[in-house]
Every structure is written in C-alpha cells, then in structure tokens.
Amino acid sequence: MSARGTSLTGMPLVSAGILLYRVTDDGLEVLLGHPGGPFYSRKDDDTWTVFKGELDGNEDRYAVALREFEEETGHLPPPDADPIDLGEIVQRGGKHVVAWALEGDLDPDEAASNTFEMEWPPRSGRTAEFPEIDRVGWFDLATASTKIRAAQRPFLERLEAALA
C-alpha cells in the first residue's frame, strides 16, 4: 500500500459488504459486526461495521460481499434475498466501501468469524491470532447509527429510504 486507502498502484482500495436486515414487531433492525483485535477491544460507538472485505483486482463486487459475509459470520447469506444496492461511501482513510442489504435472520450467538494474525504486543516479536469480527449484534436504526462507523451511516439511511 503506497498511502492510506490506496493500493500500490495508487488506486483507491475498495471493500464490498453486506448489511443484513430484518423487520420485527419493534421495527427495522440491522446486523453489525464489531472488529476484533486489540485496537478495538475497548471501543464500541463509531466502531461496528457492515460485514465487508477488500476486492482483489477485478473481482465481482457483489460476489466479494457475499464471500466476506460468510467469512465474517460463518454463515451463508440468505440465498433467496433480493439485494438492495446501498451504493458507495468513502471512509476517513480513503477506502471506498460498496454495500448491499439483504433481508434475513441470523442468531448472533451462532456467528463465528475467520481470524487474522498480527504481532502483539507491538515490537514483542510474538504473533497472536484474533477474530476479524469478535461480536455480532442486531440493532434498531437509532442504536445502529451510534454503533456503526460514521462513514457507513449513509448505508443505514439508504436502507431505510429503500424500504419506505
């Protein structure tokens, strides 16, 4: 990576993701993931995210979104759900994120994320393994808007507008 949010070729990094939603008696709820690892362990508000991952080259964006949902929840996305295109946002570091909403249900207690390794503690020479997503939860839109990363809030607004 040559600069934050760009690839070695200078092109912006792009991630693709899925925002799972359900409609309950209490209204619209969305499923968000809390990033794993030591940097996020004490953070909550403005930290949760849609389930997403970076594209590798010219991969199909929607296919990447579906794959990343499975990797980060341990579950296949709902196969018969009609995707709602939530468009694209740019996060603070310059990374572009595209997302689709799918209607479905998932028990957060049954979610299991893939893992990553990093040196921890810093400069210790030791490697530790962490889940990419350490918590998963359903939130009503008001709560979700405080939990989700600020740059991703438009996804919530676009979903609400699409379902109105």
Segment roles from a protein language model:
Residues 6, 84-90:
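Short, solvent-exposed loop/turn elements at beta->coil junctions and helix N-caps
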Residues 24-27, 37-40, 56-57, 93-94, ...:
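Short, charged/polar surface micro-motifs in flexible loops or helix N-caps
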Residues 128-134:
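Non-DNA-binding regulatory cores of transcription-related proteins
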Residues 137, 141-164:
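Charged phosphate-binding loop/patch that engages nucleotide di/tri-phosphates or the phosphate backbone
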Residues 1-9:
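Actinobacteria-biased recognition of intrinsically disordered, low-complexity terminal regions
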